[in-house]
Amino acid sequence: MGDIFHIPVLLEDVINLVETIYLDDGFVFVDCTLGEGGHSKAVLSKYQNINVIGIERDDVVLNRAKESLVEFSKRISYSNTWFDDFFCKYSLHRRFNFILADLGISMFHYKVAGRGFSFLEDEKLDMRLFPSDGGISAYDIVNTFDKEMLENLIYELGGEYYSRRIVKAILEYRKINKIQTSRELQRIICKAYPNVKFKINPATKTFQALRIYVNDELDRLKRSLPLWIANLSKNGILAIITFHSLEDKIVKEFFKGLTKDKYCILTKKPITSSFKEKQYNNASRSAKLRAVKKLYE
């Protein structure tokens, strides 16, 4: 199958949450963002009577997961769709004991997909998780959006303080050439930045903003939260792993708005990765896990 690129984040913490409500019969775990199957594989390995539903829109990644999880084929079913679409179409003939959504982008997309997710690779700007779905690409955005649209996008979705500098540089560059690749865009951004050292690459926030916009990440999350809650069984848990403050704020505010006598927030503060996990899994540095339990049928 080739190398597995993605190490599941906060895996031990997810397992600990499952442990608090595990039932030996009929327990169903829904992995809304299956990826290469890391969380699901750990759950299936530890609990012999758990059944898993794995949801993954990218059919290339889904096939990699199926190969990795082949030994559990009798206890896992797959859905090749977006997680919000799955729950919109799902009929409530049964509810689920545990729903997990890891909102991070798979390492496969950064390292192999060739769609311009990473500024460390010289790839055509795209950033669509599933290009055949159509929709706007990062290439379209940086080459066609006007000044105000670009500034708002980069500032609001990336939290980029230097959004105006960056947009000015983008507009100047595209007077002469189209911005074709991720490395090309990264160079434009870096030249626009002040000549001082920063903790992160100057392109990080702009690339985040483009990816969020292209894949409708925040609105998809907002649509999904009430669907996830509605599909939990009594004492079921919804666990969500976020990777930036915009996602985390949406989840935090949604949980706070739930009726206290019907739901119990299990994470007064989000769970973050341990020092040890940060050492072997760099992707876990910004991960935050929030979880809520449903108290009624």
Curated annotation (Swiss-Prot):
<keyword id="KW-0489">Methyltransferase</keyword>
<feature type="binding site">
    <location>
        <position position="56"/>
    </location>
    <ligand>
        <name>S-adenosyl-L-methionine</name>
    </ligand>
</feature>
<dbReference type="GO" id="GO:0071424">
    <property type="term" value="F:rRNA (cytosine-N4-)-methyltransferase activity"/>
</dbReference>
<comment type="similarity">
    <text>Belongs to the methyltransferase superfamily. RsmH family.</text>
</comment>
<keyword id="KW-0963">Cytoplasm</keyword>
<feature type="binding site">
    <location>
        <position position="87"/>
    </location>
    <ligand>
        <name>S-adenosyl-L-methionine</name>
    </ligand>
</feature>
<feature type="binding site">
    <location>
        <begin position="37"/>
        <end position="39"/>
    </location>
    <ligand>
        <name>S-adenosyl-L-methionine</name>
    </ligand>
</feature>
<comment type="function">
    <text>Specifically methylates the N4 position of cytidine in position 1402 (C1402) of 16S rRNA.</text>
</comment>
<dbReference type="GO" id="GO:0070475">
    <property type="term" value="P:rRNA base methylation"/>
</dbReference>
<dbReference type="InterPro" id="IPR002903">
    <property type="entry name" value="RsmH"/>
</dbReference>
<dbReference type="InterPro" id="IPR023397">
    <property type="entry name" value="SAM-dep_MeTrfase_MraW_recog"/>
</dbReference>
<dbReference type="InterPro" id="IPR029063">
    <property type="entry name" value="SAM-dependent_MTases_sf"/>
</dbReference>
<feature type="binding site">
    <location>
        <position position="109"/>
    </location>
    <ligand>
        <name>S-adenosyl-L-methionine</name>
    </ligand>
</feature>
<keyword id="KW-0698">rRNA processing</keyword>
<dbReference type="GO" id="GO:0005737">
    <property type="term" value="C:cytoplasm"/>
</dbReference>
<dbReference type="Pfam" id="PF01795">
    <property type="entry name" value="Methyltransf_5"/>
</dbReference>
<keyword id="KW-0808">Transferase</keyword>
<protein>
    <recommendedName>
        <fullName>Ribosomal RNA small subunit methyltransferase H</fullName>
        <ecNumber>2.1.1.199</ecNumber>
    </recommendedName>
</protein>
<keyword id="KW-0949">S-adenosyl-L-methionine</keyword>
<feature type="binding site">
    <location>
        <position position="102"/>
    </location>
    <ligand>
        <name>S-adenosyl-L-methionine</name>
    </ligand>
</feature>
